[in-house]
Amino acid sequence: MSCDPPVDDADVPRFWRELGLPGLVDVHVHFLPAPVQAKVWAYFEAAETHYGAAWPVHYPLPEDERLAVLSRLGVRAFPTLPYPHKPGMAAWLNDWSHDFAAAHPQVLSSATFFPEPEAPHYVAEALDRGVRVFKVHVQVGAFDPRDPLLDPVWARLAETGTPVVIHCGSGPLRGEHTGPAPMTGLLERHPRLQLVIAHLGMPEYREFLDLAERYERVHLDTTMFATDFTERLMPFDPGDRPRLGALRDRVLLGSDFPSIPYPYAEQLAALARLDLGDDWLRAVLWHNGARLFGVAA
């Protein structure tokens, strides 16, 4: 690698500049309505109960300060990625996210959905308003992505090619419908879906690499991947690094900002430590996300 990994957040711009990049595209960032964000952070405060490990949120800041942090880091484009945990939430989350993106040009307009009769209507409405990415969280939502109520939604998204960031792996918590089997079934029905597998599918990394190799529109995001925090809990087999290298054009930078238990720079340093080369880093940190979401340099 031609440049050293960043040592802290202040060093991040030096890192991407030395790679010859105009900044970063992060496909896994959360901005949520204040009451929802407060509940998320309260959950992480009790992480030892939920996960058996502490999860000290590194950026528990007011909204404007979080936006400023991303700007200083050089994150040029990012989504809000709302997700519901029960029926009746998705439509108002979508309205909030639409308004937030309209107020901040660096934000990729985001939306979500839940298996409920209204889903095809509000997904169509989001598409008509120019949504650029959807978010689905299988474990938090506690639903099967193959639910028949979602068939018309998936069919429409396969047709439009709109990316869907989907948390479907069994980490950090297993759910009834997490893991590769439900996603395999979904892709067998809708092979043209433009999916972004969050967290590289941890801990089922290998099985989700299989899916990315099998389906040309399946991508993987790096959220929390290869960091010291994650490696202690859900290690990645170094023997699979060549497969990750071969999928260079479909791996996307993700961070889970702001609710990460370490500085943002640690995610970038972890990716650099994989030693997959500068071209791989350039693709992951900028080019792939910029291409998928139409972000200009």
Language model: regions and residue ranges:
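Mid-to-C-terminal alpha-helical segments outside catalytic/metal-binding sites
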Residues: 2-27, 36-77, 247-250, 261-297
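Catalytic pocket-lining loop regions of alpha/beta-barrel enzymes
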Residues: 3-8, 132-133, 143-252
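Short, acidic/polar
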Residues: 60-70, 92, 115-126
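Conserved, mostly hydrophobic/aromatic
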Residues: 28, 70, 97, 126, ...
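Histidine-centered divalent metal-coordination motifs
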Residues: 28-34, 167, 199
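Short, well-structured secondary-structure segments
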Residues: 70, 74-89, 96-114, 135
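Active-site mouth loops of central-metabolism enzymes
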Residues: 49-60, 82, 108-117, 140-145
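Active-site-adjacent beta->alpha loops and helix N-cap segments on the catalytic face
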Residues: 89-95, 118-121, 143-153
